[in-house]
Amino acid sequence: MISFTLRTEDLSIEEIRKFYVDTQHDRENIEFLKSNVTGLLIGSRGTGKTMLLKVAEKELLEKFELNRTLPVFVSFSSAALVDNEEEKFKKWMLSKILFALQGQLKELGLLKTKNIFSLLLGKESEETDELAIKINQLIDKLEKSWKKGVIDEEPVTPFVEDIDYFKELLHSICTELSIKSIIFLFDEACHNFLPKQQREFFTLFRDLRDPKICCKAAVYPGITSYGTFEAFHDSIVKRVEKDILAEDYVEKMRDIIERQIDSRTYNILVQKGELLDSLIYAATGNPRVLLKSVYEASEKLTSLKKANVNSTLKDFYRTQMWNEYTKLGEKFDAYKEIVDWGRRFIEEKVLVETQNKNARSENEEDYDKQTIYFIIHKDAPELVKKAISILEYSGIVVLHTEGYKIRGNIYNRYQINMGIVATSTSESDLSAYINKLRKGLSIKVITEYGANSVAFKELEQIKNNINLDDGGIDLQTLLSKPIDILDIYEYQKTEIKKEGFCKLIDILKASEMDLQRAYLIGPVRARNIYNLAMNAVLEYIIG
């Protein structure tokens, strides 16, 4: 069965080379990632941050012999399971970074010894072997600390306990191997972290700054806790969203589709070009949203019919996207009221005003122009800005222009997801409406919300109920969730429950052999179920 690959993590380096579609904006971001400046890549879910990091890594590796700039891709996928105690978490992060560096050096054939420590001594020794083993054991212990077991407090090495020692180690490696600089690329740098861990990561991110060391991190808007790290002062910030008004927007988004399927299947889609383009514009520049909606609308890439496209648009943008957004209030309990307010603000205020502007009669000004834009004053209440950034995280709105000046005041201009705009109308032919909408689109037609807009009044009334500093997930509560959230067959859930594995923590505490006690659960399925339970925890945290 033909299908799309939705996540870069599932692609090999060869597939990344094949699937990546270069745009001017993406190229600028890749060059930024390859540069020797500290920076953040910000974008909502599915906008291609990991793809850009991987392409940047690949291009740096291809030119390594010439430029001697070493990229190191670092993933912190198990972070949420690590003990939250500050020093332990810092040791874990430094250990993971060190092993990622060691792996990259081995991959390039630069590390002729068993480990980094042997490299510095110039010879193999029991001492360096023991040190590498102890660091590996530390990582394993900390990643199992969610079990509330006792963590051995025995010192390991200053290299993962003191940031200055760590940096000196990296300096020595650079000198020994004639490396000009190391660029650490942190994928989902804090998507996998609990809020407290995010703040600790960004402290480390800032402390690693050095002429030989450069850090880049991919982050989400809205749910990132920076602590004392000031994103716009301590780093360069770049956005990843694609411009739907770019001349080559449709061409590039079609190219993303074409590269993942065979020519016969692609021809099925492009023969209905207007329908395909309506899905492309509805996605508002988000590749993952595009691929998911095209797959659904085309009945698993077998046909493209107007009725199916309209049905998919309605379900995807009126139901699925809003449901995913609303779940954030359940996940981040402290944010619930602000999440709920954000939905009401968009549905009851912004979309109503947007439809009023788009339905103007011929005797009204700008009657032939359409909009998906609104602006918010830079001095609007902080809770309003937070609410909008959470909407950004979900892809419901996108920051279009920062520092937009009108009548002497400074605003941020946002665009609403075009699929959301279309499905908020009473139109039955949504694909035709989207094509009409995009043809008349004008960034000058906007709805304005001033610093003290009456639209913000309700949020001011509930602000005392919101504690942004505490907006996290309690890991033990999450581990107590029933196994029903796992993506496995119902009969497997039933059999597993019979053996007493009713919650995620029951599975994670068990061995694969324990799971095999359940009827019809063999070794392969047992491992699959264990991995699903682990992934369910991580996926729930990162969204």
Residue spans for each PLM region:
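A short, basic N-terminal segment
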Residues: 1-39, 44, 59-66
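Compact, charge-rich alpha-helical regulatory domains located at protein termini
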Residues: 466-543
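AAA+ ATPase "lid" subdomain C-terminal helix
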Residues: 296-305
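C-terminal leucine-rich, beta-strand-based interaction scaffolds used for sensing/assembly
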Residues: 3-8, 289, 308-477
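P-loop NTPase nucleotide-binding core
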Residues: 37-180, 221
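The catalytic "switch" region of P-loop NTPases
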Residues: 159-282, 428-449, 466-473
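The conserved phosphate-sensing helix
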Residues: 283-294
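Short acidic, S/G/P-rich loop/turn micro-motifs used as interaction or catalytic elements
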Residues: 80-82, 189-194, 381, 398-399
